[in-house]
Amino acid sequence: MITIHEKTAQAFDTIGLGTLVPGSCIVTEELNGAYELELKHPYDEGGKWKRIGIGNIICTQTPNGKQAFRIYKIQPTLDNITVNARHIFYDLLDNYIDSFTTGNGTPQQILNGMKAAFNYTTPFTFQTNLTGISSFSASSCNPVLALLGNGEENDSIISKFGGEIKRDNFNIAIKNSVGMDRGFYIRYSKNLKGLTIDEDVSNVITRVFPIGKDGLKGTTVDSSRINEYHFPKVS
């Protein structure tokens, strides 16, 4: 069963706003990389498609159990609606670490300190079974970059200590090794009808940390529309 939930939902043990009956639903997870859902939904006569909205959360079974994915893009055609959603983990893209530095610490101590440095609190938990002692710093970046990096040496928890990330809704674990399937596919019957919107909020920013050419940081600036979103989108 695939369900859809309000933007602010943090528990997914009910049907939320209701169920969806997509023509297809594909979940793809890359090791220490992208974790996304693509869903195609018909314009069903029961109006289930009307529950689809930017920021709402789709919950579906995966090889790792029931997982939540937040909608960031909707593309309608005459036949159906294509929906793109990221695992709820990627809510962390919209948070921000201004400056975090620690001396010698264990991976768990570093994760705890990094979470305390977020621009605003989140429901996420961070656990690891990695060992070792090291210094670590992260500044002017989002938590996803601090955790996974961008491929440069020692720019993230993963590149510093190794390990593989396991994303279980709001529970994030970095382990020595995790088993995983590369993709998951669901197909349902189709019943096509009408037409609607085209939205994409993947590049929206509602809070800015200005940094001058000399590296000096100014006062944060909030958009007048910041309250239209479920949490600040920081850059």
Predicted region positions:
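Juxtamembrane "anchor/assembly" segments of surface/extracellular structural proteins
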Residues: 1-50, 88-90, 235
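Amphipathic, non-transmembrane alpha-helical segments in extracytoplasmic/periplasmic proteins
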Residues: 18, 30, 38-39, 85, ...
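Catalytic phosphate/metal-binding cores of nucleic-acid and nucleotide-processing enzymes, i.e., regions
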Residues: 21-24, 29, 173-175, 189-191, ...
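Envelope-exposed proteins and targeting segments
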Residues: 35, 67, 79-81, 168-170, ...
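A generic structural motif
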Residues: 36-41, 79-87, 171-174
